[in-house]
């Protein structure tokens, strides 16, 4: 993959669209979720056999869920719970954790989702080390709108200290992104 530096969003999009395997995974560089956690994801994609409950899996998208967010500061936890409430109210996304940077996709799902991105796409790249909450929201909203099967899997996650968190700025950006995805949906831009 040869790309000029275009920030986290641009790098993930380019990598996902050029992925060659049957599945594509993106994860945060700090490895707060260890790569070994992907072992929990793979059975979710399988259409053979079934789970312990006897149901076939066959998911198109598998996302990580940081249950309890052990080690995260209280401010981060409060921000997460507020965001969960607004997310379910505005976008009706039923997932516990949309923001964990550990997500995997079946190959055919990648192109269907990533070619429909409107806020974060090839022509609207946000530069810098991180992207706002809208990146993951838009991906999951599109996947759900397309009727793709999405599984959420509890993973081991370790809080990594960062100075990049600004509770007020990040909360306002998150709300802005929620509204942008909702407006795009109302305008029919995710068809």
Language model segments and positions:
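Long hydrophobic alpha-helices with heptad-repeat/coiled-coil character
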Residues: 1-3, 49, 141-147
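Acceptor/aglycone-binding surface of glycosyltransferases and processive sugar-polymer synthases
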Residues: 3-6, 10-18, 23, 35-129, ...
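Acidic metal-phosphate-binding loop of nucleotide-sugar-dependent transferases
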Residues: 31-33
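Hydrophobic helical membrane-anchoring modules
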Residues: 40, 116, 123-191
